[in-house]
Amino acid sequence: MAEQLIPIQWKDDALVLLDQTVLPNEVVYESFKTAEGVWDAIQVMKVRGAPAIGVSAAYGVYLGVKEVAESSAEEFIAEVKKVCAYLATSRPTAVNLFWALERMESVAKENAHLSIAQLKDRLLEEAKEIHREDEEINRQIGEHALTLFHDGMGVLTHCNAGALATTKYGTATAPMYLAKEKGWDLKIYSDETRPRLQGSTLTALELQRAGIDVTVITDNMAAMVMSQGKIDAVIVGCDRVAANGDVANKIGTLGVSILAKYYNIPFYVAAPTPTIDLKTPTGKEIPIEERDASEVINRFGQYSAPKESKVYNPAFDVTPYENVTAIITEKGIVRAPFMENLKKLFQ
């Protein structure tokens, strides 16, 4: 079996990230020792996927304050807040980023009685705990999702909600890995996911390396394979779930959900509870990141449209809750009415 790709590691007091911008052609690991480096890695998508962004940001908080000189607890906590506010500007849509930063800030405040050295140690411990928790969350999501699958199923996924977007297993791909462990033969179809192609460069790569049957299709082929009866279920990840069950995920997810509804195919969303944002009432309030035009018209160093073309490049879209069959969390499977049942997860 091919060497395991590990998206996030903590080694020698540094955050080590797998550079996902050069996959699948190169496997490059890069070390980061500053908050500025982590911010850049998140922004240019060397690390991506809501859970992985959250974990990386948590380590980024520690890296941002570990060299702070001895000071009062009040001054140190102010510095933690400053670093958190800075890292929060890296990408606006993934709620895990803000969840992790709020958690790190809370830990600093709750331990204000400690020495500065002890506070720094406590922040690193918390970042490592967030890292460990993510792996267990993913496995639990996979176990719940697997109850909706059966041997021989055809499953469509979009973008990369895989092990490369988390710390292990992934969210949408977790049942695929667990099915492999059970000896099941799922047939996975992975949308390439324009414009950054995470479905082909990342999902296909990691599943293929794991020995899972995966077929790459272009985004505009999804309707065709559904119409041919090749798809029994769709499962995607998400960057944020609003209180009413609306789901923000990689651009193109909305279209896939509409097709699934038309062909009466279950549309599942794999969502760790930190991705569920009860403070955001509906998808209309979710900020949608817009990215550079070059991703659309100059993806591989050559222009595929006139240089002067107007380009609209939202990184995410919002799937309405009406199109969602179920939201799969580490705590269980949530079905409509989502407004009511999502709240129960936190009671």
Swiss-Prot record:
EC number(s) from the headed UniProt entry: 5.3.1.-
Catalytic activity line of the entry: 5-deoxy-alpha-D-ribose 1-phosphate = 5-deoxy-D-ribulose 1-phosphate
Pathway named in the protein's UniProt entry: Carbohydrate degradation
Record key words, sorted: Carbohydrate metabolism, Isomerase
Domain of life: Bacteria
Active site per database record: 239 (proton donor)
InterPro entries: Deoxyribose1P_isomerase_DrdI, IF-2B-related, IF-M1Pi, IF_2B-like_C, Initiation_fac_2B_a/b/d, M1Pi_N, NagB/RpiA_transferase-like
Pfam (any one): IF-2B
Broad enzyme group: isomerase
Residues marked Transition state stabilizer (site): 159
Residues engaged in binding substrate: 48-50, 91, 198, 249-250
Record GO biological process: L-methionine salvage from methylthioadenosine; pentose catabolic process
Any one Gene Ontology molecular-function term assigned to this protein's record: S-methyl-5-thioribose-1-phosphate isomerase activity
Family matches, as NCBIfam families: eIF-2B_rel, PRK05720.1, salvage_mtnA
UniProt similarity note: Belongs to the EIF-2B alpha/beta/delta subunits family. DrdI subfamily.
Entries under PANTHER family matching the protein: METHYLTHIORIBOSE-1-PHOSPHATE ISOMERASE
HAMAP family: Deoxyribose1P_isomerase (MF_02229), Salvage_MtnA (MF_01678)
Known role: Catalyzes the isomerization of 5-deoxy-alpha-D-ribose 1-phosphate to 5-deoxy-D-ribulose 1-phosphate, as part of a 5-deoxyribose salvage pathway that recycles this toxic radical SAM enzyme by-product to mainstream metabolites.
Name of the protein in its database record: 5-deoxyribose 1-phosphate isomerase
Organism lineage string: Bacteria, Bacillati, Bacillota, Bacilli, Bacillales
Gene, per the UniProt record: drdI
